[in-house]
Amino acid sequence: HTHHSKPPYRVVDQKKLAEAIQAGYECYDSMKDDPHHRYLSWEYCHGAFRLNRRPQIDATIDYLCLHLAWYLASWGMLRNSFLMQKDYKIHADVVRLIYQPEWDDLWDLSPEKLSQEYYADRIMKLSESITEAYVASGAGIPTDTLLTKILLGTVGCVPAYDRYFKKA
């Protein structure tokens, strides 16, 4: 059961995807001078998720929830969101979900794989599962932008489909 009237993702041609990735590199280059730039929170968040594959203890889940919450906050994802009224532990079920073996093939997808319909469908299924996890925990329905920021910061399988990416 899905909460989207239309899929938030579509298969993007590789040239456009490569251009978007290049824009990301340029953004990264522009923040090199500030060792505490807010965009670095993505690196810390995604790095924590990559280093802690298959978390078995609640303390690790808690640690990853904190990383995810701060990353989302630093990227402005609390504004006008159900997350504004929740603590960081609201992400626990989502953290457990993304570590299920079912999603292993989505971790750090290459642009070539991202442009394939098979992976686009898998990302859609994971997005729907994330939405269902938040709804089941009484949180709310995440926007498409929030979903892609979560996927970017954790699994690293999509760029964030925010207004800048959509414009590109």
Regions found by a protein language model. Name each.
Residues 151:
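Conserved SAM-binding loop
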Residues 148:
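Acidic, metal/ion-handling microdomains and their immediate structural contexts
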